[in-house]
Amino acid sequence: MTVETFKPKQTTTLDIPVKTLEAASTNAVTTGNRIGFVSLGCPKNLVDSERILTQLRIDGYEVTNSYANADLVIVNTCGFIDAAVEESLDAVREALEENGKVIVTGCLGAKENQIREVHPDVLEITGPHSYEAVLKHVHKYVPKPEHNPFTSLIPQTGVKLTPKHYAYLKISEGCDNRCTFCIIPSLRGDLDSRPAGSILDEAKRLVESGVQEILVVSQDTSAYGKDKGGRTDFWNGMPVKQDITSLARQLGKMGAWVRLHYIYPYPWVDDLIPLMAEGLILPYLDIPMQHASPRILKMMKRPGRVDRQLEAIQRWREICPDLVIRSTFIVGFPGETEEDFQILLDFLKEARLDRVGCFKYSEVDGAVANTIAELISEDVKEDRYHRFMEVQAEISAERLARFVGRTLDILIDDVDEEGAIGRSFADAPEIDGMVFINGETELEPGMLVRARITHSDEHDLWAEVVDADTQD
């Protein structure tokens, strides 16, 4: 079951996925049990939104995509960087102006005083993954409607905010690392891994409902199970080890694409690469490296042996030649010198990463990094950002060019009057490039087709269909 959520008038300024809703209509009548929902931020937050929406539907509430139709609006906020805070506050403001009855949840909700200073009229505020508290507040202001649950059955997969052919699967909450630029542990707590059996049950339901791509997410995916103390769980009557490699192996047996996100560079990441080489999970590694200067990495409290990272990249590619590596970096970190930045550029040129995101350091309220060294001016950060992206654009173009002439499986995401738009194993939704198949207007979202790559640039691929699987 998919639902529509509002699209705030303020467009996103973030380089991360944002699921939003349609603009409010001006002529509407409320029924007393309609809830509007604004979901901002990363895929982990989107999963939280899906969970809240699912329970609302189970409780008999309707979900509307209009402010005017809504009896109450929930805003699930992001508070990771200043731009996210600003956007979240703007979304709350708009919801108050358009509707007036607003509950705020999510990461920014952990900073209630900050929200109250700007928006004192918000009804209630909860922090991240406070599902029961959100529902309790909804029941308070919009009493649970009387309904027959057998006439409004919810699919086993619950409410989804993604297209029906792919879904995010969150395997844990929180993080045990203490990177100095990050406040996630203070917002979401330490690592709390879900039982493996619960994860595999959810994945099975997703695949049985038609999901063809499972995107595994958490704050620290490769740390999955570290908090379990080596204890096994059970699934289908069999013991299952609770670590990321064992979990990935089980997920890979379900017949869908499995894509891993947010892989912290622990040594045991090596164990995942053979699974990619075997074809059990996609040969796609999203591994945020953040910087390459040992001095800056030490200040960030990140792994600082860049030589080992380069050796690992070479080793991974030898084991799995098709491996696509995505990473993110921060430029303008406090105390970053031109020498540090040049080390980062040299690393890019040597590592030849496939997909790279770059963020200018943001002085996140509460981050230790704000006070450990002199802050970098906005002009310098902007200059380094553009120089970084210029270097990476050439590398990305080179890496994508290797696909020209090859035939790949393409998962179709959208079709318009010009043709179909899809993704290969090398492309995660929302954040990576796309594969354009011009003229193929008869294809449908969710179809998996074989297509020969004919052209590439630094972001995207173009292809011609060779064969199509007509099953959605």
Curated annotation (Swiss-Prot):
Give a GO molecular function annotation for the protein: aspartic acid methylthiotransferase activity
Which InterPro entries is this protein grouped with? Answer: Elp3/MiaA/NifB-like_rSAM, Methylthiotransferase, Methylthiotransferase_CS, Methylthiotransferase_N, Methylthiotransferase_N_sf, NA-bd_OB-fold, Ribosomal_uS12_MeSTrfase_RimO, rSAM
Domain TRAM residues, every copy = 401-467
Q: Which cofactor does it need?
A: [4Fe-4S] cluster
Gene3D superfamilies referenced in this protein's UniProt entry, alphabetically = Methylthiotransferase, N-terminal domain (3.40.50.12160), Nucleic acid-binding proteins (2.40.50.140), tm_1862 like domain (3.80.30.20)
Write down how the cofactor binds this protein. Binds 2 [4Fe-4S] clusters. One cluster is coordinated with 3 cysteines and an exchangeable S-adenosyl-L-methionine.
Query: Radical SAM core domain: from which residue to which, for each copy?
Result: 161-398
User: Looking at the keywords, is S-adenosyl-L-methionine present?
Assistant: yes
Q: Which residues bind [4Fe-4S] cluster 1?
A: C42, C78, C107
Keyword terms, alphabetized: 4Fe-4S, Cytoplasm, Iron, Iron-sulfur, Metal-binding, S-adenosyl-L-methionine, Transferase
EC assignment: 2.8.4.4
Superkingdom classification of source: Bacteria
Q: Which family does it belong to?
A: Belongs to the methylthiotransferase family. RimO subfamily.
Sum up the protein's function in the record's words: Catalyzes the methylthiolation of an aspartic acid residue of ribosomal protein uS12.
What protein name is recorded for this chain?
Answer: Ribosomal protein uS12 methylthiotransferase RimO
Q: What is the lineage of its organism?
A: Bacteria, Pseudomonadati, Pseudomonadota, Gammaproteobacteria, Alteromonadales
Q: Which gene encodes it?
A: rimO
